[in-house]
From Swiss-Prot:
GO terms for molecular function: magnesium ion binding; thiamine-phosphate diphosphorylase activity. This is Thiamine-phosphate synthase. Signal peptide: none annotated. It comes from Herpetosiphon aurantiacus (strain ATCC 23779 / DSM 785 / 114-95). Pathway: Cofactor biosynthesis; thiamine diphosphate biosynthesis; thiamine phosphate from 4-amino-2-methyl-5-diphosphomethylpyrimidine and 4-methyl-5-(2-phosphoethyl)-thiazole: step 1/1. Keywords: Magnesium, Metal-binding, Thiamine biosynthesis, Transferase. 4-amino-2-methyl-5-(diphosphooxymethyl)pyrimidine binds at residues 38-42, 70, 107, 136.
Length: 206
């Protein structure tokens, strides 16, 4: 399995992207140094999402980073993606692990759920929202440092923080012991996404 740099995990959210070219955005994010790319395409059909994933995969393969499909294990298997990210309402984790050898990420609802997911074999946890976010309207109440740290300390697998993360609070997030940060709108809506990636990574290293 490839070595994964979790520090900057980008989500290519097609709803946030709007009419902009997803392949051009992917190239810009890769040029900026992201370590993981998730494709989240809730506003597209399965066919459209599959076609987009197939177009993105050669780019992520060249960059040697994983492409993770949001929610849909069947689609991840069909296109040969490196991973899938699941939530509490998606396919049960034990079934996912039994049928998929790639990366499985999970968004837990609290410490006990995070520990349960780790026992079922997930590879990483996406925990949030850290702060208030408008990207995912059903994200729930912000965890803040205390809530995030509680989950990080309760598991051994990598934890990436998501939700309301901007350059000004990267240090707060990193102080919780996370493996990395997940950024959506602050990258996709940046004037220069490549530069925005580099700035996030610079803040993460500070």
């Amino acid at each position: 399995m490839m070595q994964i740099d979790w520090r900057l995990y980008a989500v290519l959210d097609t709803a946030t992207l709007g009419s902009r070219d997803p392949l051009a955005m992917t190239a810009a994010l890769l040029a900026g140094g992201i370590g993981v790319l998730q494709l989240r395409a809730k506003n597209l059909s399965v066919r459209q999402t599959a076609q987009l994933a197939q177009a993105i995969l050669p780019l992520t393969k060249i960059a040697q980073i994983p492409l993770i499909i949001n929610d849909d294990l069947g689609l991840a298997l069909a296109v040969g993606a490196d991973g899938v990210h699941l939530g509490v309402d998606d396919l049960p984790l034990d079934l996912a692990r039994a049928s998929f050898k790639g990366l499985i990420g999970y968004s837990p609802e609290g410490v006990a759920d995070a520990q349960r997911a780790e026992k079922l074999g997930v590879d990483y946890l996406g925990v949030g929202p850290f702060a208030a976010t408008t990207t995912k309207l059903d994200a729930g109440a912000p965890l803040g440092q205390a809530g995030l740290r509680a989950i990080v300390e309760a598991v051994d697998c990598p934890v990436v923080a998501i939700g309301g993360i901007a350059q000004h609070n990267v240090a707060e997030v990193r102080a919780c012991g996370v493996a990395g940060i997940v950024v959506v709108s602050a990258l996709l809506n940046a004037t220069n996404p490549t530069q925005a990636c580099r700035e996030f990574l610079a803040h993460y290293k500070e």
